[in-house]
Amino acid sequence: MIDLYDIPKNLPDWPLHLIKERFRQSYHGDFERWRSAVESLPKAVAGPCIYGDTIRAEMPCDEKTLNAVKLALQRLHPWRKGPFCFGDLHIDTEWRSDWKWRRMQHALGDLSGQRVLDIGCGNGYFGWRALQAGAYEVVGIDPSILFCIQHYAIQRFLNDGRNWVLPIKGEELPGSVQFDLTLSMGVLYHRREPLQHIQQLFALTKVGGRGVLETLVVTDAKSLYPSGRYARMGNVWCVPSTAQVVQWMQQAGFDQVEIIDVTATTPDEQRSTEWMRFGSLSGCLDAHDPSRTIEGYPAPVRAICMGFRSS
């Protein structure tokens, strides 16, 4: 059974010591509460797993066991990325992450034998989708201890050592290990130096590999630098134009750069649920004009950009 302190064996020079340093109460005051939730999960034997739009594990169990599973997993609230289903328990997450995957899966194609890095991976949902597409292994990193622990709760049912979620920040990674596919989904606009983030994405991509960047964008020609909050988020430094995203990817070294999707985010895709009870997108939009945020900026639109590393 995979546990919190399991680490990949093929990441030389990575700061893997940080895993044990961060999986402790002194690093995050809620750690023991979250860990006890995972440890309280019944030792139910999961059946076959399906890595589709909903990540599923067949879990034959009685109603009492199912209720215990639900109570334990709800102690790991909020659940952002998904959906997941364990037996008859459906985890309706804030994001319909399957919609985002659908927008890029044709461009990604067959990932057979590829190693994938997912920066800002959350609980690892996209890692399961990459495995479905044939990936050999997925390494996800996310600074949120809660999201990492959610992943290990999921692993209690899936128990698949090909998908990792580690509590490491992107800027802490050396360039000594490179990947066939690097993903950065929903990270760029939180970076004070967006070009530097894309340069790191490039450095972590193998020659012949691809980088995929998903970010908030504006459809205007000029990038947006919010003053104060954007859609209630206080750490959005730049919402680039699509042209700016392409230019940054090219400056970082990627070629054959293209925008493969541009889609406005709607409250059908991002919303409050039983598993994410905080406010969500609908509370961030102008009540009288949903094409604007409550601060008066253009409402969220997201683009997916892909480029190749040829040298």
Give residue spans per PLM region:
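A short glycine-rich, Lys/Arg-flanked "PGG" loop and its adjoining helix->strand segment in the class I
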Residues: 195-210
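N-terminal auxiliary segments of SAM/dcSAM-dependent transferases
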Residues: 1-76
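A short SAM/SAH-binding and catalytic strip from SAM-dependent methyltransferases
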Residues: 180-194
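Short, glycine-/aromatic-enriched active-site segment of Class I SAM-dependent methyltransferases
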Residues: 215-236
